[in-house]
Amino acid sequence: MKNYSEHKDATVKKSKTVDSQSIDWFRNSTRYINSHRGCTFVIVIEGETFDSPYFTELISDLALLKSIGVRLVLVHGARPQISKAYNRCDTEIIYNESMTVTKKEEIDAISGIVGTLSSKIDAMFLSGRAAKLDQNNGIQLIRGNFLVAKPLGIKNGIDFQQTGKVRHIQVDLLRKQLDNDCLLLQSNIGYSVTGEVFNLCEIEIATEIAIALKAEKMIVMTDCDGVTDSQGALVDYLGPDESSLHASRMKSSEKGKEHLFGKQIEYSARAVQCGVNRTHIINYCSDGTLIRELFTSEGCGTLISKDDSKKLRKGRISDASEILNLIRPLEEKGLLISRSKEFLESEIDHFRVIDLEGEIVACAALHLETDTLAEISCIATSDKHQNKGLGKRLLNSLESQAKNAGITEIFVLTTEAAHWFIENNFKETSLESLPKNRQLLYDTIRKSKIFIKKV
């Protein structure tokens, strides 16, 4: 009986913990629900997404967005399905810069493939979990042709025939249907003013629709976690100019998949440059990524925006308590020296922080030792924002600040982050290379390694 009681108590405690986490998440998500309500989101669904094991869950999550008042436009492609059809017919696929040449005799078959995928999306919103979100009225999905297409023409000497591009968006029709509380679905098939049928690129269509509607968000569902840096780490925030650099790097690849992803980044940046508030690049290969990106502060993909949601700014007196909470776990592990709140308040002018919607998620400090030498210290990032490039961003900012102040060299002391500093072009040096007054402050018990870098 005793064992049963202990097991029961443990189960109750575990249940309470899970319930508490769910309640906390829901409470924290309320501000996002309120901010998203009434906004227009354009969602890009690659053809590959249809084969994801989480496609049903994605449709349910889109229905959830619709149920809280988000105005949704879905744009889907059909690249892999079309490729499979070519392979079955033993037909050669001609590519140029990741674009497919669509022959006149093939466009009817392609239209049929695309129509089947559109019907699949339509059916999924009428069944399963998606349908249960609004049992009274259901989700009214409108499959339409909300654009006028034109031929892509001849590029690099290649006639793309029935491969097209957007001529203009029928924005009034889109707005009318959105005002009628409809969920809109646009495929990658478009028609010209003369009635010709064209095969278009879904990311181009989505971008032009998002710009025309002045959408709050464009969300690109793709098969990777987002944009990565040269070391392969996820970059969770980019401005449009930085995005364009990443796009150029990816598009220079001879691999078709990387070139295509570069194109997605390029269009995502264009959307922001032309008035869309934010674009998100997230992975459809994991469950719940859309919800995590839109309803949590840490997100899970790459956000492209002119308005930096993770603001890098000078430290303020009011930040001292949050900085203390941020660095305390590192102090307890012996990775940072102990600092009091009073000390942080007195040194706050030396700090730079990354402020994510009112929460300090990373910090670092710069101290000038001489006219030409400065120390960077107290680099810390919260656990849930690790591996997102925040430390590198702070380091770059402090390096620029030091350079502007006439500093020619910066140094750091570290017990465990030696490799990270080496990756960022620091070189190990001796204690004797530091000024005498700084040598006297060296902790002989911690025995930190010293690294230096020219700026």
Which residues does each PLM region occupy?
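Conserved acetyl-CoA-binding loop of GNAT-fold acetyltransferases
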Residues: 422-432
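C-terminal "cap" of GNAT-fold acetyltransferases
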Residues: 434-455
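Conserved acetyl-CoA pyrophosphate-binding loop and the N-cap/start of the following alpha-helix
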Residues: 385, 389-397
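A short, internal acetyl-CoA/4′-phosphopantetheine-binding micro-motif in the GNAT/acyltransferase core
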Residues: 379-386, 416
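Short amphipathic alpha-helix that is part of the acyltransferase structural core
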Residues: 307-337, 447-448
